[in-house]
Amino acid sequence: MTRRACDLCPLEAFCKPATLNVQRTSKHRPAEEMRSDKESQSIRVTIVQASPQPSDLASGLRKALALIEEAAEHGAQLICFAETFLPGYPAWLDFCPGAALWNHAPVKEVFAGLRANSVVVPGNETQALGEAAARLRVGIVMGISERVRDAPGHGTLFNSLLYFAEDGRLVNHHRKLIPTYSERMVWGQGDAAGLRIAKVHNVNFGGAICWEHWMPLTRQHLHNAGEQIHIAAWPTVHEMHQIASRHYAFEGRCFVLAAGQIMKASDLPIALTPLEALDPQTLIERGGSAVIAPDGRYLAGPVFDEEIILYATLDLQEIERESMTMDVSGHYSRPDIFRLQVTASDRGDDISGK
């Protein structure tokens, strides 16, 4: 058998995808009674890699709630979803060149559909997610396209992450700081009000959305906050996104849950024509979800091209061991030379746990 160069590398374990802790939605190991506490210093985490329902928020929410229930039944304590899973990432921005045409009636209709199916915070969807979190005693991180209803900016959508604690409280609400490239046609700029950590089962967790992982000061701010678990929300976790997620884990000495979703060409709006002819079954968002350790190695995944639930039990003491060599907010930093100032004004959200 021919061996690849990486098979001979002493860092082989770091480069290769993990083969453990990957479970399909139809098959699960017996549930494990895992609850994080000071004695066990562990937490059971889950990434739900699934197909959204781009034109039907209600159906997408029902699917998400069913998957949350399933994951909780199998021991999950923290459950996360991909970028804008509700109602689904607007992949037509990447595949349909007509999306950028000025005053183009079809694209305005598609945008109106995205707006109608975006989540109001607080609203019926956040109530349902909070109730599920409280009933199942799990933390939930959900990527949404957010619509402002009764406040300034009511004509603007945001790319957001919602964080629910195990008691059902919405403990953080982050809006993506800068929509990336074509995303600026549908989403507005966010703020730093949600750029902070929250707690689930007494563990510090935070997150960032897509290309925020290439904003060095954003990373430093979250590292300074003391993340133990970081949710990296992507539409799909392709090679460069894998690199960014693993770099974040290594740099921040934290666990990273890199979450992607599955979308087919058939999910593109009929009103817009793709740049090239695509078979309806062609995958345009391929998943790639993975759980990454504080030293950058894979604990679960990455898994591509299928709907799946990934599980991993995280040993939080691993953070303590890895911090011996790197602490970018402590012994591997120079605050006497560099200073970071963050303007995080209060957005006015009624969010507990600040």
Residue ranges and their predicted role:
Residues 35-78:
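N-terminal glycine-/serine-/threonine-rich phosphate-binding loop
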Residues 57, 69-166, 235-238, 242-252:
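Cys-nucleophile CN-hydrolase/nitrilase-fold catalytic domain and related Cys-dependent amidase chemistry
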Residues 261-354:
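C-terminal beta-strand edge segments of enzyme domains
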Residues 120-121, 125-131, 146-228, 234-247, ...:
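Active-site catalytic loop in hydrolytic enzyme cores
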Residues 6-9, 15:
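Cysteine-centered motifs
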Residues 46, 162-164, 290, 310:
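Conserved hydrophobic/aromatic positions in well-ordered beta-strands
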